[in-house]
Amino acid sequence: MFRLTSARALFRVANVAARRTYAEAAADALKLNFALPHETLFAGTAVKQVNLPVKTGQIGILANHVPIVEQLVPGVVEVLEGSESKKFFVSGGFATVQPDSTLSITSVEAFPLDSFSAENVRALLAEAQKNAGAADSRVAAEASIQIEVLEALQAALK
């Protein structure tokens, strides 16, 4: 009797363990979470592809991408939803791809690319370049950061 009960319990445990080893179906869409401190731009939205400006260059993320963590640099994040493309300029941040085809982007700032004026960017860049040679080290450091961001924005607007 004891052997029969033990055998049944062992069979149930083995059966549960066997069920857990089946692979899940691959995701057919990339789920995008794009968050800023004051706003969420995308929350679990199914997208086709996202192109990111990262420290090592530009990368494109599709569904089933290998899990990664990347540092974003100033540049354009392009979100492709079907035939529509949305472009956002980010000053930096982080992107994380999860094994379940979820891409999470966090950034301090992100603005639609079409909300910028090329003339204003040129004027701000000229002012930042003047401040880069300032005697005050804090002003010079802030100006160098502004130059990096504004040059990336100017290149994106071309």
Curated annotation (Swiss-Prot):
Residues 1-22 form a transit peptide. One of its GO terms (cellular component) is proton-transporting ATP synthase complex. Keywords: ATP synthesis, CF(1), Hydrogen ion transport, Ion transport, Membrane, Mitochondrion, Mitochondrion inner membrane, Transit peptide, Transport. It holds the Pfam family ATP-synt_DE_N. Belongs to the ATPase epsilon chain family. F-type ATPases have 2 components, CF(1) - the catalytic core - and CF(0) - the membrane proton channel. CF(1) has five subunits: alpha(3), beta(3), gamma(1), delta(1), epsilon(1). CF(0) has three main subunits: a, b and c. Mitochondrial membrane ATP synthase (F(1)F(0) ATP synthase or Complex V) produces ATP from ADP in the presence of a proton gradient across the membrane which is generated by electron transport complexes of the respiratory chain. F-type ATPases consist of two structural domains, F(1) - containing the extramembraneous catalytic core, and F(0) - containing the membrane proton channel, linked together by a central stalk and a peripheral stalk. During catalysis, ATP turnover in the catalytic domain of F(1) is coupled via a rotary mechanism of the central stalk subunits to proton translocation. HAMAP family: ATP_synth_epsil_bac. This is ATP synthase subunit delta, mitochondrial.
